[in-house]
Curated annotation (Swiss-Prot):
Listed InterPro entries: ALMS_motif (IPR029299), C10orf90_N (IPR041179)
Species annotation: Mus musculus (Mouse)
Location of the region described as Required for interaction with p53/TP53 in the Swiss-Prot/TrEMBL record: 1-67
Protein name (record): (E2-independent) E3 ubiquitin-conjugating enzyme FATS
Induction comment: Upon DNA damage by agents such as ionizing radiation, UV and actinomycin D. Activated by p53/TP53.
One GO cellular component term noted in the UniProt record for this chain: centrosome
Keyword annotations: Coiled coil, Cytoplasm, Cytoskeleton, Transferase, Tumor suppressor, Ubl conjugation pathway
Length: 644
């Protein structure tokens, strides 16, 4: 954190240099200790070192295994860079701007002034960031090289170089710049024109061509206060992501010199507008601001990536750079391509990937094809994903996408894009790639830029990537409406479709709009109507036959029964109807009553028991009689034997 004392000292130095040189005051950073070689995978290399600015002095925080974080005071002596630490640590640079109270500021968006240091040393930033509207912040990482062993393919080590000179092109420094009409940051000297309060920062480093197929992780954050100004107008922050790509080739042009000597930069810049009336574009961390709290937000991060040859001449795959952030915002990316005479198309894929987890992505494509420069725009708005999800979207090379001569993408590319509308890692193509991303979805415009430029010596090729992020917040304002996006031009239709009969084309919508269902059936399905009419007639005939049969059956029944004058005539109901006739209960005769009573009496349990006992007595009596008869017969036989 930069204390107010340091800022006031810088302001005093600036006031003394108002009539002198234009170059703003620079604070030199110390030389970094070179890190030891660390083993890593071939596809992943990360460099981390932590910096911090003390309130009373500038210092470097380096990780220590025994004592934690140690502060090394800044100095320009010869004792810099003596100690060495194993492994890598992350680079964290923070700054605080002490300015007028929030009530005297107007939160708005404006174009940042150019950074003279960046513009003089490296034409990479077309629009460097501004710190707090008055202070200009620009931080550069030193270039580092990462040598790769050809035998095993593993990374041998990483070295961080720096220059002791203050005016070195790759020296880390903080630049503080104020306008001429403002001489302090205090609230007493507030400017007459209320300046927007903007917080931003940048990181700039270059990757050598000796590290193909490597992944570098950058972590650049910026502390931003969340307190709001006390004004009646809608209060909001603004979020911007800017990408800048540069690539140079050492190949010779037709006149025998390289492209840098000819001064033929491929420089294209686009801008996107962010509608400030959309509430769902804001991340959850910007919901309710709290006084005295600070929010870390991503800032400007330029990255230089290198390859052995021109990206469009079939060189090995370029490094993949991934940026990690936990916000949920819209990341606008707009790409523009110009055909260059020194580079030829190839089937090899050299791609650059940006990974921002949890962010929505919308890409707008504008293609300039050759000298015709026919433009084509496409937009896509995607919902945010959980932080853990990582889906990769690939942009095929220009040779594989087979675009038409006027910059129109193929229909197959459009269908593929519609089938996969959600992705998290947009692939930013280099200046030899064609982006087929197209959709007609209307969404909000956002600020951002992608620049592709050739401005490097001919001994190596390098690609630079600049990322500029600003967080945004706003109150719900129903009067603000989102700005509709331009419609995507539809691809040209083939000649065969255009040569079709115009009468048929006009007849189809006429049928769909003016015809009724019956008319449409008569035209397209005449047999359906005829069959329906036949079924209706058949049902009517069946009803008539049923009625005649019922009348005949009723006449026969009435003729069989005698007609009695004294008997009331009742209608005979249908047997299946619910309205059945119930006649009177008839009278029971005496005989029937006696039989009924006897049947009930015999079924009584006492009567049944009595009948069983009586039956047993009859059986016993018959057995006695049989015994007497047997005795008598036996006696007679004995008497006859004796007589003989």
């Amino acid at each position: 954190m930069i204390s107010p004392v340091v800022i006031s000292r810088l302001i005093d130095e600036k006031k003394s240099m108002e009539n002198g040189a234009i170059l703003p005051q620079a604070i030199a950073q110390p030389q970094l200790c070179p890190t030891k070689p660390a083993l890593a995978r071939r596809d992943g290399v990360s460099m981390h070192r932590r910096f911090a600015l003390s309130p009373d002095r500038l210092g470097i925080l380096t990780p220590s295994d025994d004592q934690g974080l140690e502060t090394e005071p800044l100095s320009t002596g010869d004792n810099l860079g003596k100690g060495s630490h194993s492994g890598f640590s992350s680079i964290t640079i923070t700054a605080r701007r002490v300015g007028p109270p929030a009530s005297s500021l107007v939160w708005d968006t404006f174009r940042d002034p150019l950074c003279p240091k960046c513009k003089a040393k490296d034409a990479l930033f077309q629009e460097p960031p501004v710190l707090a509207g008055d202070a200009h912040l620009c931080q550069h990482n030193r270039p580092f090289t990462c040598t790769e062993s050809p035998s095993n393919g593993s990374v041998e080590g990483m070295k961080v170089f720096q220059a002791h000179s203050r005016l070195s092109a790759r020296q880390d420094y903080w630049v503080t710049h104020t306008n001429d009409n403002e001489d302090s940051f205090s609230s007493d000297n507030s400017p007459s024109r209320k300046v927007p309060l903007v917080f931003s920062s940048c990181v700039h480093f270059r990757v050598s061509q000796q590290c193909p197929n490597a992944i570098y992780y950058l972590d650049k954050s910026l502390s931003v206060p969340l307190e709001r100004p006390q004004i009646a107008s809608p209060k909001m922050h603004r979020s911007v992501l800017s990408l800048s790509l540069r690539c140079s080739s050492h190949q010779l042009t037709a006149d025998g010199v390289d492209s840098s000597a000819n001064g033929e930069p491929i420089s294209t810049a686009l801008s996107q507008e962010l509608s400030e009336g959309k509430q769902d574009l804001l991340g959850p961390q910007w919901g309710q601001p709290q006084g005295g709290h600070w929010k870390e937000s991503p800032a400007l991060v330029p990255v230089h990536l290198g390859s052995g040859t021109c990206p469009r001449t079939g060189s090995p795959p370029l490094e993949n750079v991934k940026f990690a952030d936990v916000g949920r915002n819209q990341v606008p990316v707009r790409k523009e391509k110009e055909d260059h005479a020194t580079c030829t198309s190839s089937s090899h894929t050299n791609q650059l990937s940006i990974h921002i987890p949890g962010w929505s992505y919308r890409a707008e494509t504008k293609v300039l094809s050759g000298s015709k420069k026919q433009q084509q725009e496409a937009q896509r708005t995607l919902p945010a994903f959980p932080v853990g999800q990582k889906t990769i979207k690939h942009f095929p090379p220009e040779g594989d996408s087979s675009p038409s001569s006027d910059g129109q993408p193929s229909i197959l590319s459009e269908s593929n894009e519609r089938q996969h509308p959600y992705f998290m890692i947009p692939r930013v193509p280099l200046p030899g790639f064609y982006c087929p991303l197209q959709t007609g979805c209307a969404s909000l415009q956002e600020d951002g830029a992608v620049q592709i430029e050739t401005h490097f010596p001919k001994d190596y090729t390098c690609c630079d990537l600049v990322v500029k992020l600003k967080e945004c917040e706003k109150n719900e304002d129903p009067t603000v409406t989102p700005e509709p996006s331009p419609a995507t031009p539809s691809p040209s239709t083939p000649e065969g479709a255009q040569s079709s009969d115009p009468s048929e084309d006009s007849y189809e919508p006429l049928l769909a709009s003016s015809m009724t269902l019956q008319e449409a059936l008569e035209v397209h399905r005449p047999q359906f109507i005829s069959r329906s009419q036949e079924r209706l007639q058949k049902l009517k005939r069946m009803v008539q036959q049923r009625k005649t049969q019922q009348k005949e059956s009723l006449g026969q029944k009435q003729s069989l029964l005698p007609v009695r004058a004294n008997k009331k005539q009742f209608t005979i109901p249908h047997p299946l109807s619910d309205n059945l006739f119930k006649p009177k209960e008839r009278c029971i005769s005496e005989k029937e009553m006696h039989m009924r009573s006897k049947r009930i009496y015999n079924n009584l349990p006492e009567v049944k028991k009595k009948k069983e006992e009586q039956k047993k007595r009859m059986i016993l009596q018959s057995n006695r009689l049989r015994a007497e008869v047997f005795k008598k017969q036996l006696l007679d036989q004995l008497l006859q034997r004796n007589a003989v």
